[in-house]
Amino acid sequence: MRTIAFLITTLNLMPMKTGEYNGYVAVPPEHPLYGKGDSAEEVEALDVHGGVTYTGKIKHLPYPSELLDHKEIPRDWWVFGFDTCHYGDNPERWNLERCTEETRELQKQLEELFAQSE
């Protein structure tokens, strides 16, 4: 894998009931979506819960709660993320397992775009 998936817990960030985690995938500067914002057509086309709600560098996020790929994330990589803070989201529905699955699906889409660009 040339991307890195990770989760950040929402338990200390949100005073209301939401999912337990938000999911993120970091991509290197060579990725075709590197630097694109969440309103870019290619980013809006990504199929993830609630759409992509974060794009930016890792330095603007809290430290990951769960590094799914057991790697350090380079500071210059670009991050795409989704949150579990939508109406109807809750800790039972968006627990660690479910958020991990959704994050892996986002990672798979970003990996496929990387492969197509080569």
Predicted regions and their residues:
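Acidic interaction surfaces
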Residues: 1-118
